[in-house]
């Protein structure tokens, strides 16, 4: 039996979230989606993390940056892929050692980065 990897996509743009879901299912991930920051924070606060958390930096309610800070304090930031259309924000987080992609990203880049994160 194949060990399926899991991903939580926290993205307020529902069309983009659905596209990410399809792209991740194509490479064998089970996908959970959340569409606002507060729900994302609640889901990640008490649960065991999925293999990968794909986190939009600009969310309604609680920002992706705040959620990332919480995960970083818990030492769980290596499982996170930060996503933003803001190139400077992505570069800033990359310089700090975070996994970050500018969106929209090419499908193969997205799949490659997520697979690397899931592999540890």
PLM features per residue range, with description:
Residues 33-52:
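Acidic, metal-coordinating helix/loop segments flanking the phosphotransfer/catalytic sites
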Residues 56:
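Active-site residues of response regulator receiver
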Residues 60:
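The feature encodes the CheY-like receiver
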């Amino acid at each position: 039996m194949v060990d399926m990897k899991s991903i939580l996509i926290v993205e307020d743009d529902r069309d983009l979230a659905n596209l990410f879901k399809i792209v991740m299912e194509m490479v064998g991930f089970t996908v959970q989606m959340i569409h606002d920051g507060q729900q994302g924070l609640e889901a990640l606060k008490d649960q065991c993390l999925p293999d990968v958390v794909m986190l939009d930096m600009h969310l309604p309610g609680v920002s992706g940056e705040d959620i990332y800070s919480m995960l970083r304090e818990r030492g769980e930031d290596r499982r996170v892929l930060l996503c933003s259309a803001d190139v400077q924000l992505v570069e800033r987080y990359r310089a700090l050692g975070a996994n970050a992609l500018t969106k929209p990203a090419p499908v193969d880049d997205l799949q490659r980065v997520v697979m690397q994160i899931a592999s540890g």
